Swiss-Prot record:
It comes from Escherichia coli (strain K12). This is Uncharacterized membrane protein YohP. It is a single-pass membrane protein. Induction: Expressed in exponential phase, strongly induced in stationary phase and in minimal glucose or glycerol medium, in low oxygen, by SDS/EDTA (envelope stress) and by H(2)O(2) (at protein level). The keyword Transcription regulation does not apply.
């Protein structure tokens, strides 16, 4: 169960980094 929570957290953080990178590229 804990592994699933860590996986979700890592995916969320990577997604956040990707969104931030896209924002910096556009603006």
């Amino acid at each position: 169960m804990k592994i699933i929570l860590w996986a979700v957290l890592i995916i969320f953080l990577i997604g956040l980094l990707v969104v931030t990178g896209v924002f910096k590229m556009i603006f």
